[in-house]
Amino acid sequence: MKILHICSEMYPLIKTGGLADVMGALPYAQQQSGNDVRVLIPLYPQVAEKIGETNEVATIGTFAGLVTIRFTYFNGLGVYVIDAPHLFQRSGNPYHDSGYADYPDNYKRFALLGYLGAQLSEGLDQWWGKADILHAHDWQGGLACAYLKSWNSPVKSVFTIHNIAYPGRFHSYHLHELGLPWHFFQAEGLEFYGEISYLKAGLYFADKITTVSPTYALEITEEIAGGGMHGLLQTRKAQGRLHGVLNGVDDTVWNPETDTNIVATYKPSYMQGKSKNKAELQQMFHLPEDKDAMLMVMVTRLTEQKGADFILDRIDELMEERVQLVVLGSGSPHLEYLLNEARSRHPEQIGIYIGYNEALSHQIIAGGDVILVPSRFEPCGLTQLYGLKYGTLPLVRRTGGLADTVVDSNKESIEQRTATGFVFNYPSSDDFLEAFRRAVNLWKKNKLWSSVRQNALAQDFGWARAAASYQAIYQEIV
């Protein structure tokens, strides 16, 4: 089957979040299953630095000016890039400037991504021909599905929601400029509160919709989590067109037995390396080398969505226990300030790195005892999966993919050897604190802790399973 993925980022070429991790792994897993898979992304400066030499496929005039599509194989996978310096040759973040203001021409930049994705799926690259499946991701790829529909294309489309909180909304007057028919601007189309939504374009016009966990697929059909799209998603669910497919872990990148970003590798049958990683992490963040302190870690965006405020609200109570906390992340200036204030009060227990560092994230997860993922909502979540893989027990809220991947450590689950972490139900600092205290109590029971950790290490969230689920969805429509 010929599959073309349309996305705005792909690890290791460029990454701002979990979408990149998915796109750096899923296409490879699908290729290993015998599919002919290619990916289309913009040629950002970061991509140009890493991708190497490319060959011109086509240069065409578009609503966004003259652009060139180029092609190369990257780590064995076919990758198309959009060479349009006037749109994508910008340093830093692919979506906004250094002041966090969205680029004013984002409507055009990502409409072009969708347009060229649709063109490629229709056979613009004569050497590859037509795709069987166009698979678009998040709002940045959503218009690809609308373009295919406007051309009455036989190519089937799948649209994946990685986070429904980002609808990709723009002024309706752009519709004509982008070459889409005006009759698409209605409730049964891509109109959304008087504007156009690229996310809704994907939801409305795709043949199938997927999202990144079964629980999130249910949650987004409800008003509280549906981002205003819940009515449409209820309809798509009733039609059998909405599916939840859990993300996986890329074993070539996240594997404590082979990870080159950590000071000592380890495996379930030989865990001494994890202790060495903990000691290294404590040294890196100038914390006392205390093997008996429960070392909590957090690799996250510092936002309310991620629940960082639950931790900060009760930070002084947490620090009354024999615990340490290491945080890697950035985001809300207010939350960054509160975190720094907490460190100034507890310098022997808290370490902070404001920003993002991929290699450091591996060392932090390998060195931690508990990874905190207390999100208000979480479509799938990847850091809890990395925690399981590295024997760093996740403490999570019961939402989205967190609910699908972590089993709470209660008396019954511990006895049945199914417990893999700690789960709290309600988005509040009180509920978080209760789960934290349960984690501390288990930490003090060394044999039980080791048993739960072995359960966590035994979990299999590889990409082969997810690729098989997508294959079954594709087969329903081709």
From Swiss-Prot:
ADP-alpha-D-glucose binds at K15. GO terms for biological process: glycogen biosynthetic process. InterPro entries: Glyco_trans_1 (IPR001296), GS/SS (IPR011835), Starch_synth_cat_dom (IPR013534). SUPFAM superfamilies: UDP-Glycosyltransferase/glycogen phosphorylase. Keywords: Glycogen biosynthesis, Glycosyltransferase, Transferase. Pfam families: Glyco_transf_5, Glycos_transf_1. It catalyses: [(1->4)-alpha-D-glucosyl](n) + ADP-alpha-D-glucose = [(1->4)-alpha-D-glucosyl](n+1) + ADP + H(+). The keyword Transferase applies. GO terms for molecular function: alpha-1,4-glucan glucosyltransferase (ADP-glucose donor) activity; alpha-1,4-glucan glucosyltransferase (UDP-glucose donor) activity. One of its GO terms (cellular component) is cytosol. Synthesizes alpha-1,4-glucan chains using ADP-glucose. NCBIfam families: glgA (TIGR02095), PRK00654.1-2 (NF001899). PANTHER family: ALPHA AMYLASE DOMAIN-CONTAINING PROTEIN, GRANULE-BOUND STARCH SYNTHASE 1, CHLOROPLASTIC/AMYLOPLASTIC. This is Glycogen synthase. It comes from Actinobacillus pleuropneumoniae serotype 5b (strain L20). The gene is glgA.
